[in-house]
Amino acid sequence: MRKIIAGVFIFVFLISNLYADLVAEVTTGVIQKPLVTVVSDNVVDQFPQQVNSVMVADLNHNAKLQANDTIKYEIKQKQNIPWKSLKSDYVVLTKYTNNSYNNYTVEVQILKRNDTSYLQAITYKNINVSLMRTLAHKISNYVYQKLTGNQGFFLTKLAYVKVSNLYARYGRLYELIISDYDGYNKHVVLRQTDNPIATPSWSNDGRYIVYSSYSGGSMGVYTLEIATGKVTRITNYKGINSSPSFSPDGKEIALALSKGYSDQTNIYIMNLATKALKRITINGINTAPKFSPNGQSIVFTSDREGRPNIYVASVNSKYPQSSILSTKIHQAYEPNYTPDGKNIVFMNQSSRTSGTQIADFNLVNGSVTNITNGKADSSPTVSPYGDMVAYISTNTRGYSSLDMVSLDGDNHFNIETADNGNILIQSPSWSPKNF
């Protein structure tokens, strides 16, 4: 039985060690996006330069804007902006006042080409230099929302698992890490030796992470309270306890259980208050359940028809029943809804391409589109506002990386790469909101 349970974790390892082409830089597709130039009234002090540099990175790491900071000299007033030599559609002018040692007031003005007035302006007061990245992400969110009408995601977080000493018989280290969306400000929130951590998933209020782990001779599902570090075991069933995810209201989790010594797993919904279970599936190996944004359905992976594919089930059905998502999909794993419920992003193994890529299924028109082109791309997780997808890629040397791609497939960039084959990065989960 231990071999069966261990197989759940080995599956993640194998997927992560398939070959893939690592994408490590921003590449822009054919759709021309509005260009934003970030300029400053201070190009001498380190703090303004750092803030503007992070802002430019943020405004390039999305599906709707592109940015640069080509002006390397001070601009005090909007009248000094050299519009004729710029190709920019917008300029973000940042003005810094050094109030005291390590403390600034920052004024941000958004200007539009051929417009003599300020499009938008905002002031941030008493900002300590230690908050440099937080300030930059906050300004980027403001600019992004004003120029696109959509909320920015630059203050969101990513949770993921890092495995070290991968090939050691004993002493394998598992760390659950939370970082900023761009990989900075990493914090290890849980560390275990020789006890795997898998498939972390956030609660909608951002207070908890639910995950599965093999500990004390058995597999279980646990919650981690992020603020306190408190860990609570919430399942103790025989056999496989895996792939948990929270319902939108945080009152339930969906998970996969074998409930004994069978190698088959079924999807259940657990009420967290009463621990009561409702069974959603009845046959095959069913795993990786995710709730729809409205909480009325669950999407999951099943091999019931001979190969893994995506199925959808209603959470309100009296008896277990589910249907295949689309006959257009050959093999698929790890589905995730976009926040608007109009798309499902998943790991795709097409009959026309080798390896696995991240793909987007449009629930409105039924189209399937690969948005990555690697050979071992897996574990997609969607940003809280739906523009971007984080995922795991593995290159030809077997090194894993945490990467990001826009939902339209145009922009790719790297967040973190394992620096050797003895480290594995896996199971990313995007926070549900800005912090």
Swiss-Prot record:
Key words of the record: Cell cycle, Cell division, Periplasm, Signal
Signal peptide: 1-20
Domain of life: Bacteria
InterPro entries: 6-blade_b-propeller_TolB-like, PD40, Tol-Pal_TolB
Entry's Gene Ontology cellular component terms: periplasmic space
Keyword Membrane assigned: no
Pfam families the record matches: PD40 (PF07676)
One of the protein's GO biological processes: cell division
Locations listed in the record: Periplasm
HAMAP family documented for this protein: TolB
Family, per entry: Belongs to the TolB family.
Subunit and interaction comment: The Tol-Pal system is composed of five core proteins: the inner membrane proteins TolA, TolQ and TolR, the periplasmic protein TolB and the outer membrane protein Pal. They form a network linking the inner and outer membranes and the peptidoglycan layer.
Described function: Part of the Tol-Pal system, which plays a role in outer membrane invagination during cell division and is important for maintaining outer membrane integrity.
Protein name per the record: Tol-Pal system protein TolB
Protein's organism: Francisella tularensis subsp. holarctica (strain LVS)
